[in-house]
């Protein structure tokens, strides 16, 4: 119970910090300033798989800092450094699955766990009125980091169609 109180206090502080970033309409300020919307170009240049560590593997091993919202033995949840909505966080498995299209039958429980953690974190972040889950897969899906990740976006009215 004490951990839940600490988590709730941290989430309130994080929401205040996000509100102070000046998010208005389509312009979103992230840790590196205004996003450039160039994810497609990044995806075109990304290397699908390989031995090199990804930015997410560096966050997992704590060699790269991140604003971590949740962690357990199977996954990690952290804020996106270039948010596309007032609330934008990523849910990643600790198991290095490069793409959702490369997930195996044995990953079924893990994939379900990622979705449940996304739901629980969205609730903790105050997204009770709705949010969007996004998984980009491959170059044409604009995947720029080849470590499976679920984007959770909310905090404003999202538009349709998304792409």
Curated annotation (Swiss-Prot):
GO terms for molecular function: adenosine 5'-monophosphoramidase activity; hydrolase activity; nucleotide binding. It catalyses: adenosine 5'-phosphoramidate + H2O = AMP + NH4(+). Residues 1-17 form a transit peptide. AMP binds at residues 63, 80, 136, 142-145, 149-151. The keyword GTP-binding does not apply. Belongs to the HINT family. This is Adenosine 5'-monophosphoramidase HINT2. It comes from Homo sapiens.
């Amino acid at each position: 119970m004490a951990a839940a109180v600490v988590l709730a206090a941290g989430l309130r502080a994080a929401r205040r910090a996000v509100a102070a970033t000046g998010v208005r309409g389509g312009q979103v300020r992230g840790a590196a300033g205004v996003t450039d919307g160039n994810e497609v170009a990044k995806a075109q240049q990304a290397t699908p798989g390989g031995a090199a560590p990804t930015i997410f593997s560096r966050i997992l091993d704590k060699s790269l800092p991140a604003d971590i919202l949740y962690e357990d033995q199977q996954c990690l949840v952290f804020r996106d450094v270039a948010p596309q909505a007032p609330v934008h966080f990523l849910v990643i498995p600790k198991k290095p699955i490069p793409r959702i299209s490369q997930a195996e039958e044995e990953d079924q429980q893990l994939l379900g766990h990622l979705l449940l953690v996304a739901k629980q974190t969205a609730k903790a972040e105050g997204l009770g009125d709705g949010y969007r889950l996004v998984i980009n897969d491959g170059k044409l899906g604009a995947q720029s980091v080849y470590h499976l990740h679920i984007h959770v976006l909310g905090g404003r009215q999202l538009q349709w169609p998304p792409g």
